[in-house]
Every structure is written in C-alpha cells, then in structure tokens.
Amino acid sequence: MKTITTFENKKVLVLGLARSGEAAARLLAKLGAIVTVNDGKPFDENPTAQSLLEEGIKVVCGSHPLELLDEDFCYMIKNPGIPYNNPMVKKALEKQIPVLTEVELAYLVSESQLIGITGSNGKTTTTTMIAEVLNAGGQRGLLAGNIGFPASEVVQAADDKDILVMELSSFQLMGVKEFRPHIAVITNLMPTHLDYHGSFEDYVAAKWNIQNQMSSSDFLVLNFNQGISKELAKTTKATIVPFSTTEKVDGAYVQDKQLFYKGENIMLVDDIGVPGSHNVENALATIAVAKLAGISNQVIRETLSNFGGVKHRLQSLGKVHGISFYNDSKSTNILATQKALSGFDNTKVILIAGGLDRGNEFDELIPDITGLKHMVVLGESASRVKRAAQKAGVTYSDALDVRDAVHKAYEVAQQGDVILLSPANASWDMYKNFEVRGDEFIDTFESLRGE
C-alpha cells in the first residue's frame, strides 16, 4: 500500500457502513484522517459502529442528520448502495464536498496492478475465473470489490507484486474520477438497476466509467456479441480486445466448438467446467485477460476445465440418486435464467422459479422454458411465472418456499434429471438476499443426500 498524505488531518465523512464503509473508515484512520461514520442503523444494534467507536472513530447512528454536514468535512466516502439523490449526498455536492467511492479510495493507495471486471451478468464468475487462472499461472491475483472483499481492505495487505482482480458494480463505478485499471472487462450490458440509475443510458454511462482514465497502453475486453459494445468501443482510448461466440474477432472467439485466442486453439467448449452459454462468454473474457497477463494455454485450459463455478451462480452441488442439483440463486432476472437453461437438455430439467414481484411478465422466458420436464413456482411473482408456464405448455407445482420447492421437484425427478434453482427474480419477498435463498437450497440438497 502506498503512503499518501491526501487525507492527513482532513475531516472525512463515511456515509453508510456495511463492509465497504467499515473498511474505508479504518483505511482513512490509518492514513491520518479525522473520520466520522454515519450509519442509519441504531447504535445498540450496530456492532460494527461499536467496534469503530472503540478504535477512536466518531460514529453517528440511527439517522442521517443533514446538520452533520454543517461540519467542515473535506471529503465524503459514500457507500455504493446509497444513490446520488440521497439528501446527504445532495447536500455534500451542493457544498462542493468531493464525494468519493470506496473503490476510488482504494485505488488512490494501491500499488498493485488492477484488473477491473464489470457488466450486468457474469461479473462474479468471470472475476473468480480470472483470479484462479492468474494464481495457477504463478501470479498473485487477489479478489476484491463487489465480490465480498472490500477493495479498501484488500489493498492494505497488497504490494506491487500483487494483481487486484476487482469486481465492480455500476453503483461503485458511478462517480469514479481517477480510477484506472490496466485491464478492464465489461461482460455484457443489459437493462438492470434502472430504479437506481433512472435509465438504461445512465446505467451504461456508469459502467463505461471504468475506462475513463485508460489509455492505449491499457486493455479493454468487450463482448462483441452485443452491438452496444461495438459502438462503445469506438469511443475509448484503451486498446480493445473483443470476445465473441458468434463471429471470429481479433481476440477470443468460438469456432467449431473450440475456444480460440487470436488463432491459437485454447480448449474445447465442452471442456469448460461449468455449463451454459453465458459461461462460454465468461471463459472467453477470462482467456483474453489471461493471455494479456502472459499465462500459458495449458494453465488456462486446466484451470477452466477444473472450474467448479461460484456459490449461488449455477453452482453444481452434486447428485442424489442420479439427480443433479444446481444452485443458481443469483439469477435475479430473466436473462440470467435464460443463460442458465441454455446449458441443459430441457426435457431433463425441473426448474424452480419465482420471487419478488416487480410487475414483470415472463413472456420472454417462454421459448427457454418450452419443453421443460416440470416447473416448481414460488414467491410473489408465482402467478406471472405460471402464466408463462401455461403458454409454454409446461406442467407446474406450487411451493411455499425453496425447501418445499426442492422436495416437490425431487418427487418428479428421475435418474439423469436436473433440479435447477434459477428464480429469474430477486429474493426479497421471502429471503433477506439471494445468498440466504441459495443456502436453503444447499441445505435441502444436503438433507436429501443424507437420507
């Protein structure tokens, strides 16, 4: 970690805790800042705030009082989940207090090379694939960012021999100014998080911030399956490295069921360790980054062949009596479920779907669910999902929760079948988050395996 004096003896407000806010507060204190943390959760229910207070950091909890900004703060570090139209953020901007993101703070003190990965779907899997390939090739890839390891925590233990492999959300990228990866990946761009950004155009603009400071000596890996990526590619100073499953490009591509990089045969599509067309795209992006990093074809091939997926993202759990179980709880939109289904023979799949009702109809899903062996439907959106199943001619059962859904699916399944949790919906109608939903699926699988 570099020693910088930017924040020394400066008053800094950290707005919002969670893991990234906690890490930012501790890093700022280490850099000599006079830190105040403001979090909406009451102090007596906030062990993180209590811990920070014991370390000498001022905490204001239970609300976000605008008068707090009457103090002469020099900077605000904003939790990525807090939108820019939040009254505290708006007042800070009106007072011309610089509002930084936690990843920008981490970047300012980092002395490690940075690989940044963003996109609508596939971020976590691609980030994990890249880190595993780098490490298998003898380099030191450290996971950071939106993948569960706050960047401002990871950088404190990293040096110039490490490579930060950082997953970045649109929330984290919105507002970055100096942030500059040496290699950036945008897996794909789909309409999502529009409630936060307001429009698809603003969402894309936030993602595109990843390349703002890049130059021709940096590399931008883009999905040329998408026309929008081809158009955006014309507007960057970075060197473009495309990937595509539909055409031969000057980068990573598929030809005759094999993965290539600039004419070099890397591996067979069927040898990728996780199923689904989306994982072919993730593997291509990983290959592009790995080749730029100097990793050998053999290491790339072996790592991607042995890759078992990421928890809750088309995670293979194993088999019970010849029935395969896949946990894709991270599938919170239709596109993710479409991509998950693309890796299987529909006639052998029992799909568990449904969740938070956002008013979406699921007609887009009809071609993808046609031919399924059965569906088990749950959650607020159940009636809408069932309408799609009816139109697709697929039989279905109702379930009370994920545990009940697994048992209903298991009753229908036979040897050689697949039970797939890929809800196409957020989890918040029934579960705290998609991780809790997925954990219930895993627990039920383990119970069945133990019977």
From Swiss-Prot:
Keyword entries, A-Z: ATP-binding, Cell cycle, Cell division, Cell shape, Cell wall biogenesis/degradation, Cytoplasm, Ligase, Nucleotide-binding, Peptidoglycan synthesis
The keyword NAD appears for this protein: no
Main location (coarse class): cytoplasm
Residues involved in ATP binding: G119, S120, N121, G122, K123, T124, T125
Entry similarity comment: Belongs to the MurCDEF family.
Stored InterPro entries: Mur-like_cat_sf, Mur_ligase_C, Mur_ligase_C_dom_sf, Mur_ligase_cen, MurD
An example Gene Ontology molecular-function term: ATP binding
Example of a GO biological process term: cell division
Class of enzymatic activity (EC top level): ligase
Pathway(s) it belongs to: Cell wall biogenesis; peptidoglycan biosynthesis
Catalytic reactions of this protein: UDP-N-acetyl-alpha-D-muramoyl-L-alanine + D-glutamate + ATP = UDP-N-acetyl-alpha-D-muramoyl-L-alanyl-D-glutamate + ADP + phosphate + H(+)
Pfam families: Mur_ligase_C, Mur_ligase_M, MurD-like_N
Superkingdom per UniProt: Bacteria
Protein name: UDP-N-acetylmuramoylalanine--D-glutamate ligase
Organism from which the protein derives: Streptococcus agalactiae serotype III (strain NEM316)
Subcellular location: Cytoplasm
Encoding gene (name): murD
One GO CC term, this protein: cytoplasm
Signal peptide: none
EC id: 6.3.2.9
Function recorded in the entry: Cell wall formation. Catalyzes the addition of glutamate to the nucleotide precursor UDP-N-acetylmuramoyl-L-alanine (UMA).
